[in-house]
Amino acid sequence: MSMKPRRGTAAGKALILAALLTIAVPEAAHAKTADVTVVSPGPTMGPPTPFTGVSSHADCPDGLVSGGGADQAIGSDEMSNGNHVMGMVPSADGATEYVDTPGVVGTDAAHWMAFGGSGSRSSDAFSTTPYAICLSSNLIRHTQVVMNKAQGPSTGLSSKLVTATCPTGTVLIGGGARTTPASVGSLKPIASFPTFNDADHHFGAIAAGDGEHDPDAWTAVGGIGGGRGADNMTYAYAICSTDDIDLKHVSTTVRFTEVSGPNTASTGQTATAGCTRGEGRLVSGGAAISGGNVTTTDFGKATSGGPHLNGSFPSDAAGTPAGDGTANPSYWTAATHSGGSPSQGSYSDVWALCLDVRHGHKP
């Protein structure tokens, strides 16, 4: 006759522990993970002459790009007014842009391109450094790039807003912005940010605010100073998961900061936002120079034509750019510049997009 060990005996406790381990180990083996690494090859010098552009790229050898940015060296004299970001976008190969028919334009992009442009002035001090945020996750194994574009801005002191929206059943993990051509010296992207394709956010015209969850779209705003160009284009890019994941395990949180300035001519400003430990990994970020209140009203450009972006990049809490190989940075920084004229009422805006694959906000 066999005897079952009693619950309170050592043998009984051992059997209970063994049973719990049998249940727990498979669960742990299927834990959802997400980690990011910053890749940056360093600066590419230029543009060397007025009304030209320069491109550079960062590549993810062991993951997919979830976002990225750029940082520019501009010098310290009046020539600094001439250098501006022209684009920060995902790429299939580090050399090719997604610029054709809007919609889903690529899958599993692993490269990030950064573009710098010059106005009427150039300097040997100008350079552009790209930053790729490389995502490794056992939940988000594939991504897709959605592109949207619009003609403009084409007349002086105007802007053009365009929004790319993720397909239903996917999650937004990053985005980018681009304007062309570089030969129009005052044309540049002045905003790149996460948003929502819904009425509350005016279908992308109002940016996602601090603490908002699960944005599904990315907006780009092109701005122009005194120049004109009938062929000017503004592009927006959203980097989205594919629809084969269980969204109940995924949540994103937006962190946003807005600071006043730069207001006086030939000056710069920075703003930094970051993900808290409980919000998951920083997977991308955005930046803008604006007329303020971008999370409560439709985006409005700064009053003059000169304000522009000089950077949008992963960083530490003090705004220092993250170095090549940095694992799981927590902060994103926007670097803005007034250009050669005063710009009263300008604001610098920055967004950090935080991804949590352990807990979801959705029922």
Locate the predicted segments by residue.
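Secretory targeting and sorting signals
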Residues: 2-31
